[in-house]
Regions:
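Charged C-terminal helix
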Residues: 226-262
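Solvent-exposed, amphipathic alpha-helical segments
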Residues: 210, 214, 218-222, 235-242
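Short glycine/threonine-rich catalytic loop with a Thr-x-Gly-x-Asp
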Residues: 196-215
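Conserved N-terminal subdomain of the carbohydrate kinase-like
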Residues: 2-120, 256-259
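Glycine/charged-rich beta-loop-alpha catalytic/anionic-binding loops adjacent to active sites
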Residues: 7-13, 189-200
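Phosphate-handling active-site elements
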Residues: 37, 191-193, 218-232
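Conserved phosphate/ATP/ADP-binding segment of small-molecule kinases
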Residues: 120-193, 226
Length: 262
């Protein structure tokens, strides 16, 4: 599979991990594969995945602030901004002010938790931080845990959460919903979108980052919400199948090795 020549610029704001193919590094690799030009500004430098202890986190708020100011002076233009891991409210405000001032199309992954729990080590106000950022986002891509957190657990059904966000003008994609033996991606574009996928009883770090970046690339390429979701599902299935063949016990995805083969 070859990517088309594009060269449109995306501003990527996410964490940078010194160990592991996840976070902003994975997103940048995938978006580069689709021939987008990426400016990657890290919100934090992190020693390793949150699942591994201990962990060291360096707050790069000053760098974020100064770099965005530099880019503003350079009059850089972006097709979109993607925001993932945010460390604190100060960063959220800096980013959202930049989005508002430059009238940017924003895609947000509210990285807060999974399996019903908030990740350890996050800001105690992390839910309020991402609720604030969601007001500025055009597309929001949480897992089910994060979707519930964004709505203060008001809704029992995932479909009601998607409805809620559509009613306030947001496109909302829940990356993983389980209903009996079914596993599907849930979204809505006038009508509900349920895209089934094959459930793997394996967990690779960076799967969420993979979804974010593949979806963003496809959506910006064709501006078709449903098609972008379908293409994302199919591409992830292909990549994870290749990862299992490479090393099914790996903590993360060998993204650069895999992209070379596509």
């Amino acid at each position: 599979m070859k990517s088309c020549k594009n060269n449109e610029k995306i501003l990527l704001i996410n964490d940078f991990l010194s160990s592991g193919n996840i976070g902003g590094s994975l997103c940048k690799s995938v978006l580069n594969f689709y021939s987008f030009d990426i400016d990657f500004v890290p919100t934090a430098l992190i020693s390793n995945m949150f699942s591994l202890k201990p962990i060291e986190i360096f707050d790069s708020s000053d760098f974020l602030t100064n770099t965005l100011e530099v880019y503003k002076k350079q009059n850089r233009k972006y097709k979109a901004i993607f925001v993932g891991f945010v460390l604190n409210f100060n960063q959220a405000k800096i980013i959202c002010d930049f989005v508002k001032e430059n009238n940017l199309f924003m895609v947000l992954d509210p990285i807060m938790g999974d399996s019903g729990k908030i990740y350890s080590g996050l800001d105690k106000n992390i839910v309020e931080i991402y609720k604030y950022m969601a007001d500025y986002a055009h597309i929001i891509i949480p897992n089910l845990t994060e979707a519930r957190l964004l709505t203060d657990n008001k809704f029992k059904k995932a479909h009601d959460i998607v409805d809620y966000f559509e009613n306030i003008g947001k496109k909302f994609i829940i990356t993983s919903v389980e209903d009996g033996n079914r596993h599907f991606i849930l979204a809505k574009d006038k009508y509900f979108i349920e895209e089934d996928y094959k459930f793997l009883d394996k967990s690779f770090g960076g799967s969420g980052d993979l979804f974010d970046s593949i979806f963003l690339a496809n959506y910006l390429k064709n501006n078709d919400f449903l098609l972008a979701i379908k293409n994302t599902r199919d591409m992830i299935a292909c990549i994870l199948d290749m990862q299992i063949k490479i090393d099914d016990k790996a903590n993360d995805i060998s993204i650069n090795e895999i992209l070379k083969k596509l």
